[in-house]
Curated annotation (Swiss-Prot):
Homodimer. InterPro entries: PyrdxlP-dep_Trfase, PyrdxlP-dep_Trfase_major, PyrdxlP-dep_Trfase_small, Ser_HO-MeTrfase, Ser_HO-MeTrfase-like, SHMT-like_dom. The keyword Oxidoreductase does not apply. Catalyzes the reversible interconversion of serine and glycine with tetrahydrofolate (THF) serving as the one-carbon carrier. This reaction serves as the major source of one-carbon groups required for the biosynthesis of purines, thymidylate, methionine, and other important biomolecules. Also exhibits THF-independent aldolase activity toward beta-hydroxyamino acids, producing glycine and aldehydes, via a retro-aldol mechanism. Its cofactor is pyridoxal 5'-phosphate. This is Serine hydroxymethyltransferase. The gene is glyA.
Length: 426
């Protein structure tokens, strides 16, 4: 944080400092979160936030865009190089905005879509009733096999043949296994549907070849630019050349006005970082840490949905321990371990309570955690969840967590912020 903010707006500075301390003093296991580099933070905090740039490079509705054109072109070219995509739009403000624009590019209100059920690991924007996607379109859902808890591709095929959707959506927010995009494209082709892949969670894995890529398989690919990509918070659409014009028009002027050029600069920086060999090493460590976390929790007696993980996240089923996800989230937060409650397939509890928690390794891998730290973390989670009301257990774990994280700084956070005076807010 710019120290001058303390003079300009003490209340906001205090809130930001509080968050700096919280991030520094906790083990961050929310699967959708990560820590950006100081370079990304610098780009997002730059003077580019002052510039309006409606339109696209070379075709703006405002003057003075020659510099921001360079930034957007860099982001586009780096994304194309990283993913091998024919066309890229880097303007969506978020993953949800990217999905809405992708729908807007190829669908009309009332068209039929087929997406993964939110209760089985899908995402709100894949047709959930509470989302615009569930109000604009006629929606059907597929899910996981009740025994294996993996996507049942034969069932997807049968549903698709029955309802004949115009669009099939692949991708998930809480699915710990590899997604077979090629099989889904076969299903889409069989029923005359377009295939869209939402790779928001696995984009970093896809970028380095550690998860099968949907590029060249799905006609439309959407993603966020944070999560496993470690960039600024935003969205991106990649597509076949035949959909390029429709996608660009769907983003602007279809669903957005001016792009956030400072955020696009952050995307460009992160995409450049992802092109370096060190990024593949990082993703390899993310996957190794997830496997170790999963194996240790299983050894401690916890059941994992689908029996493990192939990617950066895992789902822990808490039913046999008599805990709701909500309580597990709360008691772990009390000891400095941040997770989120999450429904599991066929969950008997409502989403506000949930029967599981979702864990992910991208953030702490960025801070330098390796297998040894993940084993410790898993054992602490087990200790707390086996005795959620035992204050002595929580006090011990809280102290051990604090000592461990003090050795693994958050990128871009100063020593003073990490060890500053405790005001009781964290």
């Amino acid at each position: 944080m710019d120290e001058r903010l303390w003079e300009w707006d003490f209340e906001v500075a205090e809130a930001i400092a509080c968050e700096e301390r919280r991030q520094s003093r906790t083990i961050e296991l929310i699967a959708s979160e990560n820590f950006t580099s100081p370079a990304v933070l610098a780009a997002v905090g730059s003077v580019l936030t002052n510039k309006y740039a409606e339109g696209y490079p070379g075709r703006r509705y405002y003057g003075g865009c020659e510099c921001v054109d360079r930034v957007e072109e860099l982001a586009i070219q780096r994304a194309k190089q990283l993913f091998g995509a024919p066309h890229v739009n880097v303007q969506p403000h978020s993953g949800a905005q990217a999905n809405m624009a992708a729908y807007f590019a190829v669908l009309q209100p009332g068209d039929r879509i087929l997406g993964m059920s939110l209760q089985h690991g899908g995402h709100l924007t894949h047709g959930a009733k509470v989302n615009l996607s569930g109000r604009w379109f006629e929606v059907a859902f597929y899910g996981v096999d009740p025994e294996t808890e993996r996507i049942d591709y034969d069932a997807v095929w049968h549903i698709a043949r029955e309802i004949r959707p115009k669009l099939i959506i692949s991708g998930a927010s809480a699915y710990p296994r590899v997604i077979d995009f090629a099989r889904l494209r076969e299903i889409a082709d069989d029923v005359g549907a377009i295939l869209m892949a939402d790779i928001a969670h696995i984009a970093g894995l896809v970028a380095v070849g550690l998860h099968p890529s949907p590029i060249g398989v799905a006609q439309l690919v959407t993603t966020t630019t944070h999560k496993t990509l470690r960039g600024s918070r935003g969205g991106m659409i990649m597509c076949d050349a035949e959909f390029a014009e429709a996608v660009d028009k769907a983003v602007f002027p279809g669903t957005q006005g001016g792009p956030l050029m400072h955020v696009i600069a952050g995307k460009a920086v992160a995409l450049g970082e992802a092109l370096r060999p060190t990024f593949r090493t990082y993703i390899e460590r993310v996957l190794e840490n997830a496997r170790v976390l999963a194996e240790t929790l299983q050894a401690e007696g916890f059941r994992l949905v689908s029996g493990g993980t192939d990617n950066h996240l895992l789902l822990v089923d808490l039913r046999s321990h008599g805990l709701s996800g909500r309580k597990a989230e709360r008691v772990l937060d009390e000891v400095g371990i941040t997770v989120n409650k999450n429904t599991i397939p066929n969950d008997p509890k409502p989403p506000t309570q949930a029967s599981g928690i979702r864990l992910g390794t991208p953030a702490m891998t960025t801070r330098g955690f390796g297998p040894d730290e993940m084993r410790l973390t898993a054992r602490w989670i087990a200790d707390v969840l086996r005795a959620p009301d035992d204050e002595s257990v929580k006090a011990r774990v809280r102290a051990e967590v604090a000592e461990l994280v003090s050795r693994f700084p958050v990128p871009g956070v100063t020593i003073e912020a990490r060890t500053g005076v405790d005001d009781g807010t964290v």
